[in-house]
Amino acid sequence: MSTLVTLNKISVTFGSRRVLNDISLSLRPGRILTLLGPNGAGKSTLVRVVLGLIAPTSGSIIREPGLRIGYVPQKLHLDTTLPLTVSRFMRLKPGVRKADILPALKRVHAAHLLDQPMQKLSGGENQRVLLARALLNRPQLLVLDEPTQGVDVNGQLALYDLIEQLRRELGCAVLMVSHDLHLVMAKTDEVLCLNQHICCSGAPEVVSTHPEFIAMFGQRGAEQLAVYRHHHNHRHDLHGKIILKNSGSRGA
């Protein structure tokens, strides 16, 4: 399997403060890698390194030539006095064709929002629009920084199902930052626990038993993870209702 991005022994220092130390990772097509860690662990800094927004102080980064990246930021700040529809917001992205906007919104089940004001969107609707915008350049790598921030629990479930669906359909790599331990871990292939350095990494069921993971999130967090992965035999619709994968039936 080819590698889209490779980080080799990356460190980042701001002044006298070391934010990241000796980070190595690879991002591959069709795989979801989730970054977990406490506030101040360096997760957003690592995302910016992957995006090429900041250069590492030491170490090397190799990107696939011509790599197309779609990015969903942690927060979007809009002037509430500026009238801006979803359609207009989508067209602010350089190189976007008007004909591409509706298909992108349909892909994330948000076509009905096309003419809605951005300022009137709910948290979940806002994230779907940002995700649609990130898909406009047919990304090989999708980078999601806290994609469910400000979204209610039902909306979080639906968004994670959507991200997994997009990964399957597009075959893209996904780098995701999250705090939603028991939800996101059921949807990821690999976990990297970060606290300036890599505390542990690997498949969720392996990481959940690692001493440093337990020290970071507690035994209860590890138990929640194990139970959730074992029983997660369903997906969720846009309202968070359960749809069993083997029957198509719904539950409350």
UniProtKB/Swiss-Prot annotation:
* Topology with respect to the bilayer: Peripheral membrane protein
Q: Which InterPro entries match?
A: AAA+_ATPase, ABC_transporter-like_ATP-bd, Metal_Ion_Import_ABC, P-loop_NTPase
Residues bound to ATP are G37, P38, N39, G40, A41, G42, K43, S44
The yes or no answer to whether the keyword Ribonucleoprotein is present is no
What Pfam families does its record include?
ABC_tran
Q: Does the keyword Cell membrane apply?
A: yes
One GO term under biological process is:
response to zinc ion
Residue intervals of the ABC transporter domain = 5-220
Please provide the record's keywords in A-Z order.
Answer: ATP-binding, Cell inner membrane, Cell membrane, Ion transport, Membrane, Nucleotide-binding, Translocase, Transport, Zinc, Zinc transport
Which molecular-function annotation in GO is an example for this chain? ABC-type zinc transporter activity
Compartments where found: Cell inner membrane
Q: Which PANTHER family match?
A: METAL TRANSPORT SYSTEM ATP-BINDING PROTEIN TM_0124-RELATED, ZINC IMPORT ATP-BINDING PROTEIN ZNUC
User: Which NCBIfam families has this protein been placed in?
Assistant: PRK09544.1
Q: What is this protein called?
A: Zinc import ATP-binding protein ZnuC
